[in-house]
Amino acid sequence: MNSVRQLLKVKGKHVWTISKESTVLDSLELMAEKRIGSLVVIEDSQVIGIFTERDYARKVGPERRNPEETRTEEVMTRELITVDLNQTVNECMVLMVDNHIRHLPVMDDGRLVGIISVGDVVKDIIEELEFHVEQLKSYITGLR
């Protein structure tokens, strides 16, 4: 099973962030432009939360808040679940399923060094399974 470190080597470590002072509209526009589902929210270079599509769907739309006036900080998820570079992709999947989340910021010594999405996890697991299938096919073919 791959580690978060290995996954980030393939995926890359870039993380899109936004200031807590930004508006929800600013956040949504950046997410749409970058084709991503979340932004890590920062204050004084420190991670203080995450803003996701689900935050918008659950906390802005239904409450009829104005995205141009609502600050991202007001609707972001504060109880951040993170992983470190040494955790496995399987551990990430379990965290995501158990906590009903789609994004995991990756921290190293208190610093944000990447982010993993549910799509990254699924892709990695599929690639690993395909590798094992090919190994089994080769083994079976070699027995004939």
Language-model segments: what does each one mean?
Residues 1-13, 52-81, 88-97, 118-144:
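Tandem CBS (Bateman) regulatory domains
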Residues 2-48:
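A positional/architectural concept
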Residues 15-16, 38-39, 48, 73-74, ...:
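Structural motif
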Residues 18-35, 82-100, 107:
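The conserved cystathionine-beta-synthase
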Residues 22-33, 64-75, 110:
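Short, charge-rich amphipathic segments
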Residues 31-34, 39-55, 96, 104-119:
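A glycine-centered beta-loop-beta connector
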